[in-house]
């Protein structure tokens, strides 16, 4: 069996107000190829945008890969590497029996992982890490897109 291609992904989410207009950004690197993705929502939260960055990046992969995914969100990293197992056992409820927040996004992220071998990494945000800074800029650009869409819709 051949080895899976290795892809490195950097993600970030941002929100102007929480909730408020938000954006997400992702950088996918495969060998010497690089792809940037971003998007936004008119009314969202920072955690939702952090999740959307990871979901969108993983869903963009066209075949199974080994993925090193870097996020500055402890919420995403801890949620997907730890908390999610208990949530699934408890019918998507927290330890104190409350519904998991952002459950649709967590379920979508869980589904996006199935085809891949993902190693999750945390990187300190706003600490000069070039790819994280670029993902942050893409996320902020996503906020601008969301605001423009809002103006067009009004």
From Swiss-Prot:
Catalytic activity: Endonucleolytic cleavage to 5'-phosphomonoester
Gene source species: Bradyrhizobium diazoefficiens (strain JCM 10833 / BCRC 13528 / IAM 13628 / NBRC 14792 / USDA 110)
Recorded GO CC terms: cytoplasm
Occurrences of domain RNase H type-1 (ranges): 3-144
Protein's recorded name: Ribonuclease H
PROSITE patterns: RNASE_H_1
Location of this chain's protein in the cell: Cytoplasm
Binding residue positions for Mg(2+) 2: 12, 136
Location, primary (coarse class): cytoplasm
Gene: rnhA
One Pfam family here: RNase_H
Cofactor dependence: Mg(2+)
Role summary: Endonuclease that specifically degrades the RNA of RNA-DNA hybrids.
E.C. no: 3.1.26.4
Subunit structure: Monomer.
């Amino acid at each position: 069996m051949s080895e899976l291609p290795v892809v490195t992904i950097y993600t970030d989410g941002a929100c102007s107000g929480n909730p408020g207009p938000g954006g997400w950004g992702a950088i996918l690197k495969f060998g010497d190829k690089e792809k940037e993705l971003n998007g936004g929502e008119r009314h969202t939260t920072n955690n939702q945008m952090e999740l959307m960055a990871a979901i969108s990046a993983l869903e963009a992969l066209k075949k199974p890969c080994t993925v090193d995914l870097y996020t500055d969100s402890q919420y995403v990293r801890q949620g997907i590497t730890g908390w999610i197992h208990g949530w699934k056992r408890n019918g998507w409820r927290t330890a104190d029996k409350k519904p998991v927040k952002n459950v649709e996004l967590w379920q979508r992220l869980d589904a996006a992982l199935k085809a891949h071998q993902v190693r999750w990494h945390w990187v300190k945000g706003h600490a000069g890490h070039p790819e994280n800074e670029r993902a942050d800029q893409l996320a902020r650009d996503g906020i601008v897109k969301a605001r423009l869409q809002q103006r067009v819709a009004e």
